[in-house]
Amino acid sequence: MQRITITIEDDLLAEIDAAAAARGYQNRSEIIRDLARAGLQQTSEDTAQTGPCVAGLVYVYDHAARDLSKRLVQEFHGHHDLALATLHVHLDDNNCMEMTALRGAADEVRHFADHIIAERGVRYGRVVMIPTGEGKPAKARKHGHRHE
């Protein structure tokens, strides 16, 4: 076993300590090891998905973080073929939440989402991927009435 040093925000450490106490962990190392294992297991399950998918990417970030907004915009423009729409919400003076609908090959969607979530200044991120099968994207079709 190796000893490492990590930096954790105060509020996140408080959550870890509360979870450790609630679950009966003897020390921080034990709960952090278990949380890391659970995260790695989830990542393994998520990356196993292949083929076309749709996804919801949700992340919270500090809009004042150095050049983060600019980097995010550049990433989205670089992957405009994946992003269908984005909703931007101001949570407080410092934090914004964005929810983006994505569509594309699962590996490309996963890579893009992972990159956004890993950006410095992104505080929380999650992607939910749903397989769509091998069909073509839906197109408008005639259905018996008109839309004005």
UniProtKB/Swiss-Prot annotation:
InterPro entries: Acetolactate_synth/TF_NikR_C (IPR027271), ACT-like_dom_sf (IPR045865), Arc_rbn_hlx_hlx (IPR013321), CopG (IPR002145), CopG/NikR_regulator (IPR050192), Ni_resp_reg_NikR (IPR022988), Nickel_NikR_proteobac (IPR014160), Ribbon_hlx_hlx (IPR010985). The keyword Metal-binding applies. Its cofactor is Ni(2+). Signal peptide: none annotated. GO terms for molecular function: DNA binding; DNA-binding transcription factor activity; nickel cation binding. Binds 1 nickel ion per subunit. Ni(2+) binds at residues 77, 88, 90, 96. The keyword Secreted does not apply. Keywords: DNA-binding, Metal-binding, Nickel, Transcription, Transcription regulation. One of its GO terms (biological process) is regulation of DNA-templated transcription. CDD domains: RHH_NikR_HicB-like. It holds the Pfam family NikR_C. NCBIfam families: nikR, PRK02967.1, PRK04460.1. Belongs to the transcriptional regulatory CopG/NikR family. Transcriptional regulator. This is Putative nickel-responsive regulator.
